[in-house]
UniProtKB/Swiss-Prot annotation:
Residues 69-283 form the Radical SAM core domain. It comes from Clavibacter michiganensis subsp. michiganensis (strain NCPPB 382). InterPro entries: Aldolase_TIM, Elp3/MiaA/NifB-like_rSAM, LIAS_N, Lipoyl_synth, rSAM. The gene is lipA. Belongs to the radical SAM superfamily. Lipoyl synthase family. The keyword Cytoplasm applies. Pathway: Protein modification; protein lipoylation via endogenous pathway; protein N(6)-(lipoyl)lysine from octanoyl-[acyl-carrier-protein]: step 2/2. Its EC number is 2.8.1.8. GO terms for molecular function: 4 iron, 4 sulfur cluster binding; lipoate synthase activity; metal ion binding. [4Fe-4S] cluster 2 binds at C83, C87, C90. Pfam families: LIAS_N, Radical_SAM. This is Lipoyl synthase. Binds 2 [4Fe-4S] clusters per subunit. One cluster is coordinated with 3 cysteines and an exchangeable S-adenosyl-L-methionine.
């Protein structure tokens, strides 16, 4: 794929053509990682290779793979490789998804078992083509991982299911350790960047999850045209909606077809934002240039449980152990 073509030979959208007029930006020197391959990472890498397992971590070339795999955490994508919605920052392509695969929950749970994961994040594409928008698939994947891996925590990073309380209730009923729904950006530019989503609806999804008794989580991506004051306002909105955990990251442009980077946020601003979010009252906060919403997810879950005065389930007490890894994403 070049700057002038789109995946699978489809025509470029007018927005993509306009985006492609701006060359890919050169990253500043502070956005870098070192490939520190600890023993747990190397063991997982070998297992994934020999067992033909698939995670978002390696397929999206996540910069935090060395650290997360060292802590036996990984992320899986369900529902297919194509999304029925298009967000201008997201590398997942938009199109007609593949047929519904009812065996996927079993396969994901089996991968979790074979990888010996301590904590698994499950995310899915939007499936507006389905009557339940993929709610059963999300819920069943959580249920199957829990059933087959009682010592593994599960976080679901979900679409908004159009805000439908019945569909959301199906997902909530699977009782993930954390329910995450990412707002990603601020109200003023939300519709331009996420045209199929609605800011207030996303906040309401988080509120519904909170009311269902779940630990809740969201993410903000900086560098897409927001102002610093708007970041503060979005943090307050999310906390007021019932969000327990927040991650904040730098936008990195996936290809010339995607939204150009508006600004590079310096590390000291992320430190400032983290302190601000903690002062607002979030129970768990990670902010940094290479933080991703699933980064150190098990640690943030354990931290939030302690802050709420809740006991970690006996089978998940290991998530409160001193963290392994190298903490590159926040530096």
């Amino acid at each position: 794929m070049t700057a002038a073509t789109a995946p699978d030979g489809r025509r470029m959208l007018r927005l993509e053509v306009r985006n492609a007029e701006t060359p890919i930006e050169r990253k500043p020197g502070w956005i870098k990682t070192t490939a520190r391959m600890g023993p747990e990472y190397q063991a997982l890498q070998q297992l994934v290779k020999t067992e033909d397992l698939h995670t978002v971590c390696q397929e999206a070339a996540c910069p935090n793979i060395y650290e997360c795999w060292e802590d036996r955490e990984a992320t899986f994508l369900i529902g297919g490789s194509q999304c029925t919605r298009r967000c201008d920052f997201c590398q997942i392509d938009t199109g007609k998804p593949a047929d519904y695969d009812t065996d996927e929950p079993r396969r994901v749970a089996d991968s979790v078992r074979r990888m010996g994961l301590r904590y698994a994040t499950v995310t899915g594409v939007a499936r507006d083509d389905l009557p339940d928008e993929g709610a059963w698939l999300h819920a069943e994947t959580v249920r199957r991982i829990h059933a087959d891996n009682p010592g593994t925590g599960v976080e679901i990073l979900a679409t908004d299911f159009s805000g439908n309380p019945d569909l959301l209730a199906e997902v909530f009923s699977s009782r993930p350790e954390v329910f995450a729904h990412n707002v990603e950006t601020v109200p003023r530019i939300f519709k331009r960047i996420r045209p199929a989503f609605r800011y207030e609806r996303s906040l309401d999804v988080i509120t519904q999850a909170r009311d269902a008794g779940l630990i809740t989580k969201s993410n903000l991506i900086l560098g897409m045209g927001e102002t610093r004051d708007e970041v503060s306002e979005a943090l307050v909105d999310l906390h007021d909606a019932g969000c327990d955990i927040i991650t904040v990251t730098q936008y990195l442009r996936p290809s010339p077809r995607h939204l150009p980077v508006a600004r590079w946020v310096r590390p000291e601003e992320f430190v400032e934002i983290k302190a601000e979010a903690e002062a607002i009252g979030f129970l768990g906060v990670l902010a940094g240039p290479l933080v991703r919403s699933s980064y150190r997810a098990g640690r943030l879950y354990a931290q939030s449980m302690r802050a709420k005065g809740r006991e970690l389930p006996e089978g998940l007490a290991h998530l409160a152990d001193p963290a392994n890894g190298f903490a590159q994403a926040v530096g």
